[in-house]
Design a protein with these regions (language model features):
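Acidic, metal-coordinating catalytic cores used for nucleic-acid/nucleotide bond scission
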Residues: 62-73
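Gly/Thr-rich phosphate-binding beta-strand-loop-beta motif of the actin/hexokinase/Hsp70
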Residues: 1-23, 119
Length: 342
């Protein structure tokens, strides 16, 4: 059993800055290495670990979430059986390491090398939590769905751009320009349809995901986008099992803002949530106000009480979240209660 080392990785598109910290001192001279962010670079990481006398069973890696840039490194770490943890960039930004007199450079210098040392010190401070709850890549189906739903959003955004141009500028454009824009919009709609078809194929290949998808789509207003998005974010309701926790994650849970005698901000939703999921829930809520009798009655009742529209809409979003988690917990499709009241 070798000594325990805490290794921080600053991930970028081209390379990885890697530094280790032993919990006592920072080895400025030999404690850092830069490698390419590809397979050849990962082999260099293994050689570097051997050079500094680190046992792979005694090292703890830590890195920030950087999307696709850290995907290959995470796969390599899991193949090698190395424990690692992922940290939010917001947490790293607020992290204040306990620095000695010879480590003050970490406070003053902003480079990739210094960032890797800061991440290593964060890893040491939170090592117990990382070892008890190590990060793992989700199943390949979630990764495929995540990329497909991102592709669909790009097509929808481009289509909205051209639609706005046709509406606002068609009177000033030539006939050829209008024709080309309409052709592009037609092509984008076709790509959206093809992307959705591929999403459905990926969903149908996994029985557990397919079951959850069908249950979610039984809820009024919930379609392919919101159902798939919820399955991805919760990893099919295994990573997040509590509806209140999910509401907090997407930013629809009200939070208090108070300090002393002067600051009394009241309850407001946080801006730190996953805003895309929050926006998609807004679309579902507006649909439910028009189509769902219970939601419509709730909206009218609260409006009559003088409640602000945004507050009511946020409450409806939470009702939809509760419905999604309820159908998964009960493993039964959603049933509209009003249909049995006649």
């Amino acid at each position: 059993m070798g000594r325990e080392l805490y290794i921080g990785v600053d991930v970028s598109k081209r390379w990885l800055d890697i530094a280790y910290y032993d919990g006592i001192t920072v080895d400025w001279k030999h404690g850092h290495v830069r490698v390419d962010n590809k397979d050849s670079g990962f082999l260099q990481i293994g050689k570097w670990l051997d050079r500094i006398g680190a046992d792979k069973t005694c090292v703890l890696f830590c890195m920030e979430y950087t999307g696709l840039y850290c995907q290959d490194l995470r796969q390599w770490l899991e193949r090698e059986g190395i424990i690692y943890g992922m940290v939010s960039p917001r947490k790293m930004h607020r992290f204040e390491p306990d620095l000695g007199s010879d480590e003050r450079a970490l406070d003053r210098i902003k480079t990739d090398e210094m960032d890797s040392f800061r991440i290593a010190m964060y890893c040491e401070k939170h090592s117990r939590k990382i070892k008890s709850q190590p990060s793992r890549l989700p199943a390949q189906a979630y990764f495929k769905l995540k990329r497909l739903i991102a592709e669909r959003r790009q097509y929808v955004a481009c289509s909205a751009l051209y639609k706005g141009q046709l509406h606002d500028c068609c009177a000033y454009d030539s006939d050829g320009s209008v024709k080309r824009k309409k052709e592009v919009m037609k092509s984008l709609k076709m790509h959206v349809r093809q992307t959705e078809e591929e999403m459905l194929r990926v969903i149908s290949e996994n029985d557990a995901i397919k079951r959850s998808f069908d249950l979610l789509c039984s809820i009024t207003g919930v379609g392919i986008v919101v159902a798939t998005e919820t399955i991805i974010l919760t990893e099919n309701f295994t990573a997040i099992t509590n509806p209140r926790r999910y509401a907090c994650y997407v930013g629809i849970a009200p939070a208090r803002k108070e300090s002393g005698d002067s600051v009394r901000g009241g309850n407001h939703v946080s801006r730190k949530g996953f805003t895309q999921a929050k926006a998609d829930l807004s679309v579902v809520s507006l649909h439910c106000i028009n189509r769902d009798p219970n939601i419509k009655a709730y909206w009218l009742r609260k409006k009559a009480e003088g409640k602000h529209g945004g507050v009511i809409l946020n409450a409806i979003k939470f009702k939809i979240v509760l419905r999604m988690f309820a159908v998964i917990r009960r493993q039964k499709p959603f049933v509209e209660i009003d249909s049995y009241r006649k």
